[in-house]
């Protein structure tokens, strides 16, 4: 049995942000997943970075699975053109199912929802509830303040260095995908 990365869960903003480079990053990331035949698992939205990510993966012939709570479907932000859209009851179920369907996790730029998802997945790995890599794509230094905080948490004795090391950080999307795939030995 040779484990490999077949599906990647991507957390990112339901907004586009005010820097067009982030939207471009989401599109390039979606297309890169399709090129590598990696299924995109994401939060199921049709707007913001989430929508751009999914649309680009689909346009490049990729498989896209969205997981969205009924609350957001009711607000009509669900993406109806996906390979598969799973509707769940709660935000917690959404995170759990996204994790179940994925081999690894990546956060692109986003806000507190993105942070919530990344930190929960990272906590699952830290606690041994799963053995899936977690990564941060630090595009244009967006996450520099977060990385500085994590280093501060290590210095202050609240984050063991071995747990800090569980979060991979890259600035380039292809380097990040290469590193994730290498962690599976494929």
Protein language model annotation of sequence segments:
Residues 1-101, 140-186:
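A cross-family phosphate/adenosyl-ligand binding-site feature
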């Amino acid at each position: 049995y040779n484990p490999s990365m077949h599906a990647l869960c991507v957390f990112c903003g339901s907004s586009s942000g005010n820097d067009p480079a982030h939207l471009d990053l989401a599109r390039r990331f979606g297309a890169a997943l399709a090129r590598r035949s990696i299924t995109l698992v994401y939060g199921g939205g049709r707007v913001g970075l989430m929508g751009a990510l999914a649309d680009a993966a689909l346009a490049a012939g990729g498989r896209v699975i969205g997981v969205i709570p009924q609350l957001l479907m009711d607000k009509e932000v669900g993406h109806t053109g996906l390979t598969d859209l799973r509707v769940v009851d709660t935000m917690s179920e959404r995170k759990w199912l996204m994790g179940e369907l994925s081999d690894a996790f990546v956060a692109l730029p986003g806000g507190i929802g993105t942070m919530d998802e990344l930190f929960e997945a990272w906590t699952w790995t830290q606690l041994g509830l799963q053995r899936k890599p977690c990564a941060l794509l630090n595009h244009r230094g967006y996450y520099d303040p977060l990385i500085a905080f994590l280093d501060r948490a290590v210095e202050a004795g609240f984050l063991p260095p071995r747990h800090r090391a569980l979060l991979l950080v890259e600035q380039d999307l292809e380097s990040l995908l290469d590193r994730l795939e290498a962690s599976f030995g494929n």
